[in-house]
Structure formats: C-alpha cells, structure tokens
Amino acid sequence: MKTELLKEKYIKYELTQDDVFKHQHYIIITRSGIEKIAAIENIGIHFEIVKCETNFAAVKAIGDNGEISIETFGSALKGESYKDGNTNTWYCLEMAEKGAMSRVVLKLTGFYELGVFGEDEAEDFKKNNN
C-alpha cells in the first residue's frame, strides 16, 4: 500500500530519479523535488526567525496550500563536525530555512506520513553521504 501511494505521488508531482533517492533507512526527496512539489501544490510559505546567532538559527515555517495551514520548525547548529552540530557552514539561518521548507512541503502533501524526508532536513540525508 505504501509503495502504491508513493508511486502515485511521484507521478502526480512529476518526480524523476534526480528528485528522489533511497537513504540507508529512508526515502529522501532532493531540493529540486521539494521545489517541484511546492510549485504544483501552490504552497505558500512564510518564515519567522525564532533565534539567529553566530552559529545557531531556528526558523518557524508556516505553510499553506489553500486548504490546510501548518507550522513547523527548522534549526541549524554549526559545529566542527556533525558530531557537535548539524551543519558545518556559517550560513545557519539559510540552512534552518531550507530544512523548515522541506518539512512544510512534505507534511502538507502527505509524504511525511509515508516516511519520506527532505534532503535539506539533515546533513546525513545528503545524497553523497549514503
């Protein structure tokens, strides 16, 4: 059943092999896939900065598709490695925003309940880390 639902969603959102890949434990949708889904569903997203410091940022994302509105969060902590942070870049606010956007889109479209995550939600989900 889950496989059939995923297949239907891949077709509906015109996702290609470049947009989706298998992580060791999860199915991951890339940034390009998230953008396609958001455009097809006409999802509007508003961001509010919760906290922004030199090496930490938290963002609240409010997403709306005309029928449903949800709120979720994204955060980024710069560390020396992924053992003491979830990013190694200095642009924490942008990373938090990307994660929050992925989460909003996937929640509004039902991918989250199928165990699908966005590539921007965790460095461990990047394609080259598999």
Residue ranges and their predicted role:
Residues 1-130:
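Polyanion-binding surfaces on beta-sheet-dominated domains and ring/shell assemblies
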